[in-house]
């Protein structure tokens, strides 16, 4: 059916899109600095900086969200490399993981730093094997 074809094309183009973004340098505008709480869900505390990438729209119609690793103080913005993508299996949006260009993180290290929020979702962490 036409609808099923559209879903398959969407899934393939999404996979290509994710693979193309891994390793890219992006600028994250921080709207939830390290040490703050989620504006709506007050029990979610941000142990790392979190924000969005201006001009890149996510499937939820908002700008692409990103976790920032490797920065140990609250910041307003950060430029770094997309080292992983958190693909939520039960949500429409992915979260990108951005870190300083010269830092490497294992899947386990990434998971440890994002679980404060991702524990509420089913997800997989996508990354290039060369990041390990």
Task: State the predicted function of each range.
Residues 20-132:
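Hydrophobic N-terminal alpha-helices or hydrophobic patches in metabolic proteins across all domains
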Residues 1-20:
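Short, Lys/Arg-enriched N-terminal segments with co-localized hydrophobic residues
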């Amino acid at each position: 059916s036409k609808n099923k074809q559209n879903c398959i094309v969407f899934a393939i183009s999404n996979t290509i899109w994710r693979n193309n973004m891994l390793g890219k340098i992006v600028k994250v505008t921080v709207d939830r600095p390290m040490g703050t709480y989620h504006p709506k869900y007050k029990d979610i505390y941000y142990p790392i900086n979190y924000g969005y990438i201006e001009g890149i729209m996510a499937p939820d119609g908002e700008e692409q969200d990103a976790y920032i690793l490797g920065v140990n103080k609250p910041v307003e913005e950060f430029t770094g490399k997309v080292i992983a993508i958190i693909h939520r299996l039960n949500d429409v949006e992915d979260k990108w993981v951005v870190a300083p260009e010269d830092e490497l993180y294992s899947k386990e290290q990434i998971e440890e730093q994002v679980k404060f929020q991702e524990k509420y979702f089913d997800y997989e962490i996508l990354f290039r094997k060369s990041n390990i």
